[in-house]
């Protein structure tokens, strides 16, 4: 009985196992394949996890409503797998190939990664394959030979690389192919022309090269073609074949040759023609007038020239016409007035002239008129006031004149009015903000008069108000309480009355400039409510009373200037909250009392000017704690007493010091440690003792201090020694010492005469030596002999550089003495050399921490030798563009400091040298880097000096890529030319690219490349994003550093403005960078 029981139990277990296994295996192959796929998914949404399950009663996934699964009519095989936008991640397993009846596969908008499985080729019934918007990588598998039914193929927006498989050309049923936004390379397959049913082709935003295949032009059904943002070249042939169905064509950001195809007019169905920055040349073909259906024409940022063809007026469906950033000239054709559907006319940055045809101002559909930076003239007609949809009227930097129509704004649609830099006269129209939409109110730099309309107080949408440099008068209106207003500049007018208190209610104001007016009364304490304010300039007015302590609420203030008013009292102690302040100007007022001790807490202060007040007492030692002081310290014309505090010697970065016209006493010895000083004025005090030798070569002023003297041991020019008496109290020599000196001198004279006799004898015999070639007035030099010995008489093996002005050698004299020797080759006219000698002696007196210091100069018959300290890190060009593999990447902070240092040096040449020195050839090769990566400008002054003296002088001075447009064919240079070159260097620092980079299309430089990229970039506030050096991407994830890069880019674009008068001075550049340096430390915002 017992054995029988065991047998029954065994049979029952066997049956259970049998039926269990049978139930598992009952799920068909498609179901098992799906479950296998599930194992490769990292993240599975609930809809999938809860429905993709084994069920003992079902044999197919079709009967249990598996999420995303659709089967055929029989309910046995899977035909559709649609998991689009399901939040899936992981990989696509090879089991996908087991779904052999699959017709539709849509896994788009997920986070799949890894390779595309080659087993997809087994899904031979596939008609629709969408794997777009994932993170697939690797090459596209060559599987399309077996997918003959494929009609829609979407692989766009992944990280796929490699070539486009030629087998795609065998997909004869293909209608829609999208592979854009990947990293595909190589050429577009010629076989793609076999896809005769193809209607939509998107290959944009890859790395494709070569020409568009000829077969592509034969696709008669092609309606939309997108190949922008590649490296395609060759000539374009659209219109030469049947393109009647082509609706959209975008070829932007490639490097094609030639111009717009003259036959393009044959593509009569075109709705959108976009060819931005394609390197197009030549003229705009008149055949484009045949495009009656086209609504968008964008040929911006090319090199198109000639006139705008009048035939464009036949494009009766045109809504957007963008021809900006080309070289178009002549007048705007009146035929454009026929474009009754035109909404946006963008012709800025060309060479257009004449008046805008009156008919264009009558196109009622116009929303944007952007024609700035041309040479257009004429008056603004009253018809502009009748454009009910006009949003943007941007005409700045032209030659428009006359009155602005008084009814402008009654059309209620205006959002931006920018007429800056024209010759408009008359009054400001009173209804500009009638529609309560106006954001930009910019009428600066015109000849407007009258008052600001009172209606401005109701305009709550304003963001920027610029009315500076006009002839406006009257009382400033009250401003509405606003959270959008960020910028107000009403400077350089004749406004009277008090500062509106209502400005204090505009909580997001970043900049207020009311300088150079006739404002009176007190500074309103309500301005202290502006917690984001970065710049407040109230200088050159008639303001009075004390500084309100409430201004301490402006905790982010960078720049505070109330100079040239009638303010009085002392500096409120509450201003210690200005921790970010970089510039403080209180000059030319009636302030009194001592310099407050709390100023030492403003450790980012780089410029302090409190001249011509009634400050008194001793200069506090705490001033020496202002380690960031660099641009200037001006305490002149006050009543300070006592000695200069020794702590002042800690201000090692200070470049300008003015303590003149006080009652200071004692020695100047503390100033000898200030190595960066390039301008000093200590005149009209009561200083005593020797003048520090480091100050004697600067633009220093010492008059009015009768007890100052020069040490007899100082090696200074005869002119300087003549101006000052020698210091007294030197040890009197005894009679026997005098006798010895006299005897020694006599022997020296005899030896010198003998040596001169030998030299003359050698010359008569025709013996040539290096020293014999030195001009007599220069004398012989022991140091020169050392230099020649160290370089084997300037042997080529010691060459470390060649430039436009000569060859540079490295001379190692031992004991750590390293020099760079520049050899200049002269022409044979000695008179020019004598002039050069005087000029170079002048250069030798120039001292600045960011300029290469000329140590010695020797003039010889055929050349001159200039001796400089050797710079171990080479040039900025070497550091930025030729970094060794092992070298660290030049990070953004270092690049910013380099930009700031160069600006300081160039500003000194332009504004602190008399006469000013124009460099003429600013470029990275002429900027040398010391061991601390501090930049030093070299070759300053040489371009002008050598113009008439060197063998190699060219007609046009400067280097291609750095020459300002106005100097392309001229030898005359100006400060503005240097500013342009500096702007190019800034762009190199931001982008990491050369001025003429190999990656640019032919004849494109870095300035035009940056402008073109930014013109098509969607985020107008992020000017650094699309151009920044890829090596900086990680570092610039820091919001503050990124903002700094954006502002530097904007500054570079201003420096490289086509019009010299629009460029900032180098002093302005220094100010902007210094303020930005401080501002970025404290906030991620920016001053606009």
From Swiss-Prot:
Q: Which stretches of this protein does UniProt put in the Extracellular compartment?
A: 27-739
What broad class of enzyme is this? transferase
GO MF terms on file? ATP binding; peptide binding; protein serine kinase activity; protein serine/threonine kinase activity
Which InterPro entries does the UniProt entry name for this protein?
Kinase-like_dom_sf, Leu-rich_rpt, Leu-rich_rpt_typical-subtyp, LRR_dom_sf, LRR_N_plant-typ, Plant_RL_S/T_kinase, Prot_kinase_dom, Protein_kinase_ATP_BS
Question: What is the protein's membrane topology class?
Answer: Single-pass type I membrane protein
Q: Which residues are glycosylated?
A: 55, 82, 122, 149, 159, 183, 194, 209, 229, 266, 279, 314, 373, 411, 537, 568, 658, 698
Q: Where does ATP bind?
A: 800-808, 822
Catalytic residues, chain numbering: 921
Localization: Cell membrane
* Residues the record lists as Phosphotyrosine modifications: 868, 908, 962, 969
Q: Which GO terms describe its cellular component?
A: plasma membrane
* Cytoplasmic membrane side: 761-1088
Write out the ranges of the repeats annotated as LRR. Answer: 75-99, 100-122, 123-146, 147-170, 172-194, 195-219, 221-243, 244-267, 269-291, 292-315, 316-339, 341-363, 365-387, 388-411, 412-435, 436-459, 460-485, 487-506, 507-529, 530-554, 556-577, 578-602, 603-627, 629-651, 652-676, 678-698
KW Nucleotide-binding (keyword) present: yes
Q: Where is the signal peptide?
A: 1-26
* Complexes and interactors: Interacts with BAK1. Interacts with CLE14.
| Protein family per UniProt | Belongs to the protein kinase superfamily. Ser/Thr protein kinase family.
Q: What does this protein do?
A: Acts as a receptor for PEP defense peptides. Unlike typical immune receptors, senses an endogenous elicitor that potentiates PAMP-inducible plant responses.
Name of the protein in question: Leucine-rich repeat receptor-like protein kinase PEPR2
What lineage is on file? Eukaryota, Viridiplantae, Streptophyta, Embryophyta, Tracheophyta
